[in-house]
């Protein structure tokens, strides 16, 4: 495989403020610079790479986006599409699909790539599962992705709320297939507790994103652990061999080609069935800079390599995201 010819830049890391520099108020969102300033690492000014021609987002016409947003607000629901500033939001909303984000809009982590707000979350909304179940039924969705912020403040990491949402959706829409995109449930005894709870009503697809190569974890996913995430995927699969597992990688954060391939091998070695690979795009000037734009040829080479490794489905392309066309990905893994 050949290395991308797209220009790349070096990354300069500077020491961040202490995460405990100021008390957090429950439910108050910290965004952009306020969030990243609490991270263990920050990024010195770096030249901005011009987006190449293959990074383009289509904005559809019509009222589909506004109609879906209105329905979500009516039911007090949140989508990760909006909260994380996903570049595919117009296409997905235009097709009437969305990835629902449960457990609030405030995350206990401070990942440098993510545009979701950081802070001290409020308690879970006990009415959210019922609202979600009704909304999915009203929209007639056949495939639903449910994700969440990290909830390190909860003893089970939010696993019971996931199960409550799965149960509510299946009660109203028994034919709907459900994919969950979970946090890592990191903490003493938390993974075991979460997996035990998820066994009450497992999803149709279990997704947890590895996000990046292990050497970049400190800069990209402070508070997370590469091996822990691999173990979560493997342990879930061991308990539910019939449920496809899935993970995703972002490119453009400073990784090398061989590091990407090594991470793909690690995922297969931990019994992951499906993989998504896409280009990282910087949400704001405060976030981790884009250090490289990988070419479509690179993504095709990684797709081919993924199938060589034995993944049942590989979605690899500049605009691919974990939940993008998730129903199509699931069909490739035998979910119908």
Swiss-Prot record:
Species = Stenotrophomonas maltophilia (strain R551-3)
Q: Say yes or no: keyword Ribosomal protein present.
A: no
What InterPro entries does the record tag this protein with?
Answer: Aldolase_TIM, Elp3/MiaA/NifB-like_rSAM, LIAS_N, Lipoyl_synth, rSAM
> What lineage is this protein's organism placed in?
Bacteria, Pseudomonadati, Pseudomonadota, Gammaproteobacteria, Lysobacterales
Name of the protein this chain belongs to: Lipoyl synthase
Name the Enzyme Commission number(s) assigned to this protein: 2.8.1.8
Classification via CDD domains: Radical_SAM
From the Swiss-Prot or TrEMBL record, what is one GO molecular function term?
Answer: metal ion binding
The record ties this protein, via PROSITE patterns, to: RADICAL_SAM
